[in-house]
Amino acid sequence: MSNLTYLQGYPEQLLSQVRTLINEQRLGDVLAKRYPGTHDYATDKALWQYTQDLKNQFLRNAPPINKVMYDNKIHVLKNALGLHTAVSRVQGGKLKAKVEIRVATVFRNAPEPFLRMIVVHELAHLKEKEHNKAFYQLCCHMEPQYHQLEFDTRLWLTQLSLGQNKI
């Protein structure tokens, strides 16, 4: 139980509260009360439209996104929740860049705020490549509750990994 993989780096006092919720088997209930239901973006096409809507709202001048999809290999292979890639190819003597965003399949059945947090995170990489202060400021600009949602997403993933009742 001391190995809370998704919550490493958080203060011990906070981890103690999480352990209490886990021991009392209340973590799933707390999350379900805070984030009832799931989102309607279960297909790659719906995810692409959702991502485009957020991009057009906050990052109009960012490079276009060529592909957005759920990827069932992300979690296992990369130990990540989402990936952004920019692939450069030579096409007719010119260099073309293609931008892709991939979201872990586990978010297909997640509450909408958790999906939003992941998409906002990956969109922020269009402007800021590194996880620095400017990156997190951009995330908070697009989603004011970004840090709370990131923590709650980590709680949700912890709860899923323990096999407790799901949201």
From Swiss-Prot:
CDD domains: M48_yhfN_like. Pfam families: YgjP-like (PF01863). Its EC number is 3.6.1.-. Transmembrane segments: none annotated. Gene3D superfamilies: Metalloproteases ('zincins'), catalytic domain. Specifically catalyzes the hydrolysis of UTP to UMP and diphosphate in vitro, albeit at apparently slow rate. Shows no activity towards ATP, GTP, CTP, dTTP and ITP as substrates. This is UTP pyrophosphatase. It comes from Escherichia coli (strain K12). The gene is ygjP.
